[in-house]
Amino acid sequence: DCDGQMNLTRFYLPEFDPAVNYSMASLLMGDGEPVWEDNLVPLEPGLNLIPGSPDLYNLDLDAIKDGVSAPENVRNFVDCVREDDGADFFIFDCPPGFTTASVGALMAADEVVIPMLVDGFSFAGTQDMAQQISNLRRANQGVRIAGVLITQWHNSDVVRQGEQLLRSMGVPVFQQTIRRTDKVPE
């Protein structure tokens, strides 16, 4: 969980206390456990989590203040896991901005899925993200956009037109969408 808001962590681990447990912030600061498996919280067989932490916000502030950032620690962690054949894939839940943790995730990623609500701000954000991923290829030549995943889709003219516009932008778009439902916020 690369987001200081910790929604993914709170969903899976409502009682998680980042003050006494390792987190993505620990990993980025180089304070994680030396054995990669000890940084994971097992959720189910084959599903593990490196929890988020509000310390991720402090990490970004420290990086600005001190000019020190360690996003390569995420790539080093992923490389260690891959060397041991310890995971089939990684999913990094990132905030909608370029934080230290999200840059670390992008440096370690092979493919990026961009979830997108069809609205004007999201089109600009998707274009910005595509450009940033292109720029990031200097540090990670293998990263590419797997596709944009349209979220909160519903059958309306505005959404259908937005979807057509998105498909004309030259960014891959998944055929599958995530429908809008009132049940999720409840």
Residue spans of the language-model regions?
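P-loop NTP-binding core
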Residues: 1-186
